[in-house]
Amino acid sequence: MRKIVINGGLPLQGEITISGAKNSVVALIPAIILADDVVTLDCVPDISDVASLVEIMELMGATVKRYDDVLEIDPRGVQNIPMPYGKINSLRASYYFYGSLLGRFGEATVGLPGGCDLGPRPIDLHLKAFEAMGATASYEGDNMKLSAKDTGLHGASIYMDTVSVGATINTMIAAVKANGRTIIENAAREPEIIDVATLLNNMGAHIRGAGTNIIIIDGVERLHGTRHQVIPDRIEAGTYISLAAAVGKGIRINNVLYEHLEGFVAKLEEMGVRMTVSEDSIFVEEQSNLKAINIKTAPYPGFATDLQQPLTPLLLRANGRGTIVDTIYEKRVNHVFELAKMDADISTTNGHILYTGGRDLRGASVKATDLRAGAALVIAGLMAEGKTEITNIEFILRGYSDIIEKLRNLGADIRLVED
């Protein structure tokens, strides 16, 4: 069993460079199946989710080369083999194979998605969209079988009953080679959707409106190869900004797109966090006299659900009381019980998190219950006096590229230990 060991209480300073966006690249890689030539991705994060996707692509027949942060994928040899529950179930984003395999082969058999347990994340919206485009869906045990083999996919007008990033992207992927026009209404607006649309358009797709609540896709017959740079990871950036405000004595966060973080930065400014925003970086000063605030997550451009957990340790430094309400994933509260082991004054009731700041944290043995909870525990461990041991760290390595090295470069006493 591997664990992360932190000796906390040290002031950190220096610079961190943000990697490519996890939530983009996990959709970009399956989307490449639609191309009929080589596609190269730049700024690919070194995370286990990418390694798993590469392994799946190779099992399907793709040729993949990786050097540094560049991923070169030749999808011409991909075969439509069933991808049963197993390797697939470790990935929430495995559902993007539904759209790409349907778009290329007219059918797909894929295990149901896994990832972090944050409460219901039904694929009903995905299936509704595929069915509107002419596919049939059936369950075979833990697998989902989709088919439009006889008639092919056709354009459709699709209204998303709930704003969903995954369903919006998946519908877009499936629609780019469908016959006719597809219109997605009440579409999600996240930057990662624009990133996927940019890749697909550079491959020859006709997508308009990505980043708005109405997306229009006119189907094309073929998609060609291209080269694409993954956008910076706004969630990683927000995580390190929180860390810098919590334990930093001056930390610069590089490769940041401020427009992707405006809602998050606004809440930090409400707390009294002092920072300087530049063209592609944010400098976070040493902080004092922070004020407790209330957080309520919302779809983009609101406060991102993926950032409420990494922000929580910083809130525990603030003076006063506050609440955190996650309207997206109601079960995103498991970090509360682990932070309480570190002597945090924090609790949860009826899905609401209640906290009182100002109490010093103490090192403890804690467990990462999901990706962003793990990030919160790393920040808390760096804040705490004494030693913190974090187990279940595979969740953390799923989404944070080179996290140990990046934190060591700031002066953190942190290491990965093999038991």
UniProtKB/Swiss-Prot annotation:
GO terms for biological process: cell division; cell wall organization; peptidoglycan biosynthetic process; regulation of cell shape; UDP-N-acetylgalactosamine biosynthetic process. GO terms for cellular component: cytoplasm. It catalyses: phosphoenolpyruvate + UDP-N-acetyl-alpha-D-glucosamine = UDP-N-acetyl-3-O-(1-carboxyvinyl)-alpha-D-glucosamine + phosphate. It comes from the Bacteria. Keywords: Cell cycle, Cell division, Cell shape, Cell wall biogenesis/degradation, Cytoplasm, Peptidoglycan synthesis, Pyruvate, Transferase. The modification 2-(S-cysteinyl)pyruvic acid O-phosphothioketal is found at C116. The active site is at C116. The keyword Cytoplasm applies. Its main location: cytoplasm. Pathway: Cell wall biogenesis; peptidoglycan biosynthesis. It is an enzyme of class 2 (transferase). UDP-N-acetyl-alpha-D-glucosamine binds at R92, R121, P122, I123, D124, L125, D306, I328. Its EC number is 2.5.1.7. Pfam families: EPSP_synthase (PF00275). Phosphoenolpyruvate binds at K22, N23. It is found in: Cytoplasm. GO terms for molecular function: UDP-N-acetylglucosamine 1-carboxyvinyltransferase activity. The keyword Cytoplasm applies. Cell wall formation. Adds enolpyruvyl to UDP-N-acetylglucosamine. Belongs to the EPSP synthase family. MurA subfamily. This is UDP-N-acetylglucosamine 1-carboxyvinyltransferase 2.
